């Protein structure tokens, strides 16, 4: 069987006002991520990783921020659409390993809900979804709580 790996990364600014969604889950915080969509940094990194594994470009190619139909869209819908491409190409998702970097809030209490939601959407088990959290030790834009970012690796397998 053939395997392919993809890597994704995404960044968003943080500011007062918007809600903060990470890995489908709304996380209570005084700041939220700013973006054309709901700015779910983790789902965007996973989308980029799946697209990369298929050599189909990136999230901006498929869902341009110049297209009003994606304005404030729920990133779950983007993830589902990218996953449909994975299936159309004859692959399945094997596993995901991801890291989210932000100074605050602490997100690991929400990781089980994130894993469950992502696993459900991608038809895999929670054990196949790894979510880790880290900080920049107060360095840079993330350390100043001006933004956050996420990395994701996705392994896909060609179905027979």
Residue ranges and their predicted role:
Residues 2-112:
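RNase III-family endoribonuclease catalytic core
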Residues 97-106, 110-142:
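Short, conserved loop-to-beta-strand elements that form functional interface hotspots
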Residues 142-160:
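C-terminal edge-of-domain segments
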């Amino acid at each position: 069987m053939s395997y392919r790996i993809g890597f994704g990364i995404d960044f968003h600014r943080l500011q007062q006002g918007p809600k903060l969604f990470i890995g489908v889950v709304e996380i209570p915080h005084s700041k939220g991520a700013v973006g054309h969509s709901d700015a779910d940094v983790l789902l965007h990194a996973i989308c980029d990783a799946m697209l990369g594994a298929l050599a189909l470009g990136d999230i901006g190619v498929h869902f341009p921020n110049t297209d009003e139909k994606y304005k404030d869209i729920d990133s779950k819908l983007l993830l589902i659409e990218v996953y449909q491409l994975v299936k159309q190409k004859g692959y399945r998702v094997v596993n995901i390993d991801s890291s989210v970097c932000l100074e605050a809030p602490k997100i690991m209490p929400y990781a089980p809900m994130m894993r469950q939601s992502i696993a459900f959407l991608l038809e895999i088990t929670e054990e196949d979804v790894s979510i880790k959290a880290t900080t920049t030790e107060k360095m840079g834009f993330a350390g100043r709580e001006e933004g956050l970012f996420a990395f994701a690796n996705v392994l896909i397998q060609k179905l027979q």
